[in-house]
């Protein structure tokens, strides 16, 4: 008789290989889950790389910053791999990987743009919301500047409107360090190599 018990998801299986998958919009729910997985993997082994695969259209700035801050908080190197698209907050997370360990596949695309926000309420509420989004725009540009070597002014100018980058353009800009067609060409086999190899 076949086992009818609950089967672990493919994402649980990937986690055993220290792979975290962000394959959707960045939201509070998946940001909390990704941050928890980063902390779990760091607690299990603070020296082994953690792999974050990204195929995301972006999403919530505050949720994305929770992931970003956790990536910086753990002692592990974070290997990022962009597959499909890394747009908006997805771009920031891809770029936030450990320098030298940021990868993109040949057909992936990266989107840089300024943060979006919808405003409503009283004039005071709208002013407060506008100040918050301007602060976040400044902070996101500073992070991208530090990670790419571009000036904050250049990042702001380049992201003033939606700007899509091919894999090669993303490499040239400094969002990533390598273009790879195979996990075998990624540090640690992209998380697919047996432990200790």
Swiss-Prot record:
PROSITE patterns: CLP_PROTEASE_HIS. It is an enzyme of class 3 (hydrolase). The active site is at 88 (nucleophile), 113. It comes from the Bacteria. The keyword DNA damage does not apply. It is found in: Cytoplasm. GO terms for molecular function: ATP-dependent peptidase activity; ATPase binding; serine-type endopeptidase activity. GO terms for biological process: protein quality control for misfolded or incompletely synthesized proteins. Its EC number is 3.4.21.92. It holds the Pfam family CLP_protease. It catalyses: Hydrolysis of proteins to small peptides in the presence of ATP and magnesium. alpha-casein is the usual test substrate. In the absence of ATP, only oligopeptides shorter than five residues are hydrolyzed (such as succinyl-Leu-Tyr-|-NHMec, and Leu-Tyr-Leu-|-Tyr-Trp, in which cleavage of the -Tyr-|-Leu- and -Tyr-|-Trp bonds also occurs). Keywords: Cytoplasm, Hydrolase, Protease, Serine protease. One of its GO terms (cellular component) is cytoplasm. Belongs to the peptidase S14 family. Fourteen ClpP subunits assemble into 2 heptameric rings which stack back to back to give a disk-like structure with a central cavity, resembling the structure of eukaryotic proteasomes. Cleaves peptides in various proteins in a process that requires ATP hydrolysis. Has a chymotrypsin-like activity. Plays a major role in the degradation of misfolded proteins. This is ATP-dependent Clp protease proteolytic subunit 1. The lineage of its organism: Bacteria, Bacillati, Actinomycetota, Actinomycetes, Micrococcales.
